[in-house]
């Protein structure tokens, strides 16, 4: 039962795209990925960053939100790195297609297999910025993850919006310290 988590990559104080560059570098850290990298924007941090910045410049959309970072996580022992790669590759192809520059990687450095996706905030086909609306996770994003997981014989997420058992980010972070 993979779960998809979402976050945006904003512009740092003073402008620029340092957060985007740092996020790309983090997800492509070779100490974590074992070379399990894919996407349509390149395979090195420099190449991916340049492709995304070129798209922003082409459409004159260099300000504001720079990109998005999704994480798809599997419980320990549920998915192999090859299955995780296939799930995340298919998720990206279905959800992002060729509309957005993206890169993804599988991190194998934890007990649980998980993949990171970073995609550009600017649609490379029409120049519009990606918009996440309240409810998109439940209506579109997690159902794609579930459908792709089932395609590979992995269970879907059992989600009850009235019985939230997860921890808030603050609670999770406090436990780590």
Residue spans of the language-model regions?
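N-terminal nicking endonuclease/strand-transfer module with a His-rich metal-binding environment
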Residues: 1-177
């Amino acid at each position: 039962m993979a779960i998809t988590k979402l976050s945006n990559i904003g512009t740092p104080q003073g402008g620029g795209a340092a957060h985007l560059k740092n996020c790309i570098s983090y997800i492509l850290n070779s100490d974590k990925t074992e070379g399990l990298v894919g996407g349509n924007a390149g395979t090195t941090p420099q190449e991916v960053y340049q492709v995304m910045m070129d798209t922003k410049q082409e459409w004159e959309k260099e300000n504001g939100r720079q990109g998005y970072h999704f994480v798809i996580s599997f419980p320990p022992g549920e998915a192999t790195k090859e299955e995780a790669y296939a799930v995340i590759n298919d998720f990206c192809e279905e959800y992002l297609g060729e509309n957005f520059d993206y890169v993804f990687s599988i991190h194998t450095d934890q007990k649980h297999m998980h993949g990171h996706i970073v995609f550009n905030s600017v649609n490379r086909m029409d120049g519009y910025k990606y918009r996440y609306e309240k409810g998109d996770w439940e209506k579109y994003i997690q159902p794609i993850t579930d459908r792709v997981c089932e395609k590979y014989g992995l269970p879907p997420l059992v989600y009850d919006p009235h019985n939230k058992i997860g921890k808030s980010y603050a609670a999770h972070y406090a436990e780590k310290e």
